[in-house]
């Protein structure tokens, strides 16, 4: 997941288009707010700590990215960002744009709305499969009649039972690894491969 509100959208537009081209059109951009709860990283570096403001910055940055990936000139005058007649070329391989997955706390409606507007949902700080199922139901309701492909990712520890999450709507499973895990442990998880 990418704390997009911490970055300049024009730079991210170019970086993501390049990554999408290098990967042959396989990039998925995961975005979220991030937070200061991780050792005060935002407040200690002079970055925005207010969730609401970072949410506004994230939404504005996403609008810029979508416009930039179109290959058309971008003119944006927002509360947080300004772009005057810039054309971002080359375009990404994927059309109409690079897929965006939005992270959200399952009980927070505003980020769930954001996730519903894009291509995927990545719930964070899950308490279990029941909370996951409720969040999936909410996102599906928010998407309404939108039948475009949509992904729902879940992050679980190695050895977790994935089946209940798949039944609740998960389309992707990602392995959750603690920050202090050793390289040998990571290699072990990779070599073990997916359960089942």
State where each predicted segment sits.
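Active-site-adjacent structural elements that line small-molecule/cofactor binding pockets in enzymes
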Residues: 1-196
């Amino acid at each position: 997941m990418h704390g997009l509100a911490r970055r300049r959208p024009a730079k991210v537009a170019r970086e993501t288009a390049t990554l999408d081209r290098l990967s042959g059109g396989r990039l998925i951009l995961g975005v979220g707010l991030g937070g200061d709860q991780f050792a005060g990283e935002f407040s200690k570096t002079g970055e925005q700590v207010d969730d609401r403001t970072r949410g506004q910055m994230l939404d504005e940055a996403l609008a810029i990215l979508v416009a930039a990936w179109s290959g058309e000139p971008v003119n944006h005058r927002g509360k947080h960002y300004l772009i005057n007649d810039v054309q971002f070329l080359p375009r990404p391989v994927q059309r109409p744009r690079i897929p965006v997955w939005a992270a959200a706390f399952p009980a927070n409606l505003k980020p769930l709305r954001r996730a519903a507007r894009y291509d995927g949902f990545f719930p964070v700080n899950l308490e279990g499969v029941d909370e996951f199922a409720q969040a999936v139901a909410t996102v599906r309701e928010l998407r309404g009649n939108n039948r475009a492909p949509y992904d729902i990712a879940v992050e679980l520890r190695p050895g977790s039972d994935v089946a209940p999450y798949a039944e609740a709507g998960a389309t992707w499973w990602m392995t959750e690894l603690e920050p202090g895990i050793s390289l040998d442990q990571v290699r072990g998880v990779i070599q073990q491969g997916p359960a089942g």
